[in-house]
């Protein structure tokens, strides 16, 4: 259980230390570290991943006496988090079985997010104010012969995507195929104002049945 903030390096060292002793490391986050609207750099270090639930995190709510699972974590272009929540009351069920829940065979979850019709204005604004994140995205676009300022609303579909790859501390799985299948699915299917989101297993099964040539 981690109740208070700590450095990214210390979290990495502690996690690796436990794993080197043969332990499976599962962090439960105290109130100060609960996910809110945006994902912090430290919170990235507590993320886990499964094919059935995508990115997820465990939170411990001492006041309500529940263990909370936030799963199917995605981010929109404004950086806001979108996810589903499942709660497990204390004393109900076997704790080890609960912690294995994201990896167990189950009906694949899904949810939908309405697309932001003002996103082009937002991105132009971010570039005008030279926000580092969007300046980097613009630089990457230039290298591809693209310009973010010229994009129309449909060009930003899908607006909600999995957590970007980077310095995950608890995830050792190669996520390349997940990111690839995710993007390919929405390119292949008709653009929709209501974007439906699925776990990694869904996209894998989709392309297993519909091989992209």
Where are these regions (language model features)?
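Non-catalytic C-terminal interaction segments of nucleic acid-processing enzymes
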Residues: 42-213
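Catalytic cores of nucleic-acid endonucleases
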Residues: 3-59
């Amino acid at each position: 259980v981690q109740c208070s903030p700590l450095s990214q390096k210390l979290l990495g060292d502690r996690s690796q230390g436990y794993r080197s002793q043969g332990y499976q490391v599962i962090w439960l986050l105290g109130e100060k570290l609960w996910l809110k609207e945006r994902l912090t750099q430290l919170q990235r270090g507590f993320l886990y991943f499964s094919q059935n639930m995508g990115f997820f995190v465990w939170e411990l709510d001492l006041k309500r006496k529940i263990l909370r699972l936030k799963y199917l974590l995605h981010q929109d272009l404004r950086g806001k988090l979108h996810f589903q929540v499942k709660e497990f009351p204390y004393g109900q069920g076997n704790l080890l079985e609960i912690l294995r829940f994201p990896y167990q065979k189950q009906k694949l979850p899904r949810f939908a997010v309405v697309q932001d019709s003002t996103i082009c204005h937002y991105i132009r604004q971010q570039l005008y104010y030279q926000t580092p994140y969007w300046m980097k995205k613009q630089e990457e676009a230039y290298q591809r012969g693209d310009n973010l300022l010229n994009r129309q609303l449909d060009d930003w579909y899908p607006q909600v995507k999995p957590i970007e790859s980077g310095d995950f501390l608890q995830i050792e799985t190669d996520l390349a195929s997940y990111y690839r299948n995710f993007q390919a699915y929405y390119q292949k299917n008709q653009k929709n104002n209501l974007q439906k989101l699925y776990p990694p297993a869904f996209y894998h099964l989709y392309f297993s049945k519909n091989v992209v040539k």
